[in-house]
Amino acid sequence: MAVKRLIETFVPENYKIFLDIDRKTKKIKGQVAITGEAKDSVIAFHAKGLHFSKVRAFSVDTNFIENEEDEEIVVKIGETGRVTVSFEYEAELTDNMMGIYPSYYEVNGEKKMLIGTQFESHFARQAFPSIDEPEAKATFDLSVKFDEEEGDIIVSNMPELLNINGIHVFERTVKMSSYLLAFVFGELQFKKGKTKSGVEVGAFATKDHSEAALDFPLDIAIRSIEFYEDYYKTPYPLPHSWHIALPDFSAGAMENWGCITYREVCMLVDPENATIQSKQYVATVIAHELAHQWFGDLVTMQWWDDLWLNESFANNMEYVCMDALEPSWNVWESFSISEANMALNRDATDGVQSVHVEVTHPDEIGTLFDPAIVYAKGSRLMVMLRKWLGDEDFAAGLALYFKRHQYGNTVGDNLWDALAEVSGKDVAAFMHSWVNQPGYPVVTAEVIDDTLVLSQKQFFVGEGADKGRLWNVPLNTNWSGLPDLLSSEKVEIPGFAALKAKNDGKALFLNDANMAHYIIDYKGQLLTDLLSEVETLENVTKFQILQDRKLLAKAGVISYADVVNILPAFTNEESYLVNTGLSQLISELELFVDEDSETEKAFQSLVGKLFAKNYARLGWDKVAGESAGDESLRGIVLSKTLYAENADAKAKASQIFAAHKENLAGIPADIRPIVLNNEIKTTNSAELVKTYRETYVKTSLQEFKRELEGAVALIKDEKVIAELLESFKNADIVKPQDIAFSWFYLLRNDFSQDAAWAWEKANWAFLEEKLGGDMSYDKFVIYPGNTFKTADKLAEYKAFFEPKLENQGLKRSIEMAIKQITARVALIDSQKADVDKSIKEISEKL
């Protein structure tokens, strides 16, 4: 049932909010006055978990009804027109990382509490009565009183105006949506700087971190704001930009306007021992949130079905920004590895959501934050659009969009209109097929009787209903003489031999630089030509060959055995991008390999041979002046070499562990997870798991914490695994925000999978209580769908989750997971024998 829009009866203009918060009792006392235009004599405001004692309108007490089911308070004001409605109420701090909530941490063994907020998507209503809809933009006058202690500070969207007897009064905000209001208070350390245009920028964290951990995020934030101001040709709209790392946080980060909050691992960087991947990740997260300060905050989607306007765009711009600020990082390679790969895999399952999807009820909003679709696919579409328009027109169109719609709300067509006005191209016609349709096409390229035939149809992994969908496919080819777009089902280009000669006899390839959202099935001579030139192709094209052949095999269009046969062509590659493509393919092939089998021995040998040259070249030690690509590649090479049971690598890993056993965090970060994993695999020691766990609890280094959790999950000891699982219910050991990651590490390992699955089923009520509404909640649906590969597990999954299909927040994820497991089981059954044979044959030949 569609939820009613409260803005239809009341349009807010200003909120005056006073909150009195006590950390010890976890109680909130609130007084809120909302001024706006009443369009009805009976109006409603969103409210959840708020206990009202008084409501006034037109300066007199008025009747009200609390409707818990619809999360509303209904107020009878008796007339229409401009009115101020005031509320007095009490509430409690939440413990599920939504609304106003506490974060817990320790400094030198002393337990402390920080208070922060998370109001996106519709959780402002848990803090104050509001029209909690993105279209209902208003200004906010915020005042906060709290049980202040020495060393405490408070920050919010706007600068603090004054402090009256412990009441912190903040300047009025600009006009914005309720979900962007934010504040944080507690004992925080910080560093500040300024942009060239005078915007004050600050990085904040608790004092259990090194102060130097703030340097990198502060530098990235300052430079990113400067980049966006220039690129958008639109000034940053606020006087400051605060960046706050919270010990407990449900998402990765949140773009609160001027007061951005982060999970600690997404913002803080160990200045003495951080990987290049960690720096890149933190930098792109910061750039993503800052992109939102314009696209999402200054201009906001009208309703949640256009969430992609926020997230797809910001996900694209984080890479545009970082490519400009740190060109040596080659971040577009990372885009292909992560975003493109994630989108292509998820978007190939029948039933997947489109980028733009109708939202009828707030319970469905959480399902929109599918990172593979709204973020990854959406950003891939923006990359495609930027290439089609050209960067100059793309940037100019954005500047026009911001100028035209600042402090307002939009739908997707408003963006297309601005880009079309600048470029002269019909952007809406080009983009509608991509944004409004689920899935993507496979373009088949073949030569028939000297005619090049290019055709498109929707690509499915597993069963899929072909509904005849067509896309405007940019061919982006390396040849001249071909059309720019494939918009029909098929196009035929005669005279292939002559056309090839005009293009110097080069092999034909499509989708140059992997910038458009489709894959290619090259048939016959076209594939042979590509593979014969593989050493001279661009790295991204080599990666695409591996990417596309892997997906075609996953769909059963070709066999994984065919893919194994092309692996020898990639043994001499030094590129991080290409070797990551190999690594991803190897992970897929592991599905067919039984533990302790002859095939496993042959596969280990094959993997070792594929990475032998890079192992000899890179070794274990970072070299001064080496490229970001080599630094990133080392971990992949070492991991695969150890998988291959390389005696030299295993001995070296053990030596490094022994040299650092008194300070595990001191292992060089780029090899640390490999060393930690190897020691558990080698010793299978329960005592070592205990050491890792004790280290996990004590350290404040979030990247190191994840590495330790990944390592302990490799233990093959049922008693220890049971203890690990039980510890997830102890927040002093594993924070609720980290349960999903820690649990998945156990689920993905064959030895511990049954125990992890049993724990999930037995503790579903606990997960609902702790994580219901949290952005990691549906991971407990999705992760098994990404992992299970047997008919028995499929039956168990259906038995447990099909009764939960009535939950709108989980429905699509459950249906998708069932299809994914079904397809995986069928794939293994149909291809295993051929894949085993090919692995053995190629391993012997290589």
Swiss-Prot record:
Keyword Isomerase part of the UniProt annotation: no
Organism: Lactococcus lactis subsp. lactis (strain IL1403) (Streptococcus lactis)
Reactions mediated catalytically: Release of an N-terminal amino acid, Xaa-|-Yaa- from a peptide, amide or arylamide. Xaa is preferably Ala, but may be most amino acids including Pro (slow action). When a terminal hydrophobic residue is followed by a prolyl residue, the two may be released as an intact Xaa-Pro dipeptide
Subcellular location: Cytoplasm
Active-site residues per Swiss-Prot or TrEMBL entry: 289
Protein function: Aminopeptidase with broad substrate specificity to several peptides. It has more affinity for oligopeptides than for dipeptides. It plays an essential role in the metabolism, it may be involved in nitrogen supply or protein turnover.
Chief location bin: cytoplasm
Name used for this protein in its record: Aminopeptidase N
Membership in a protein family: Belongs to the peptidase M1 family.
Assembly description: Monomer.
Gene Ontology BP terms: peptide catabolic process; proteolysis
Free-text cofactor note: Binds 1 zinc ion per subunit.
Keyword terms, alphabetized: Aminopeptidase, Cytoplasm, Hydrolase, Metal-binding, Metalloprotease, Protease, Zinc
SUPFAM superfamilies associated with the record: Leukotriene A4 hydrolase N-terminal domain, Metalloproteases ('zincins'), catalytic domain
Record-level GO cellular component terms: cytoplasm; extracellular space; membrane
Lineage of source species: Bacteria, Bacillati, Bacillota, Bacilli, Lactobacillales
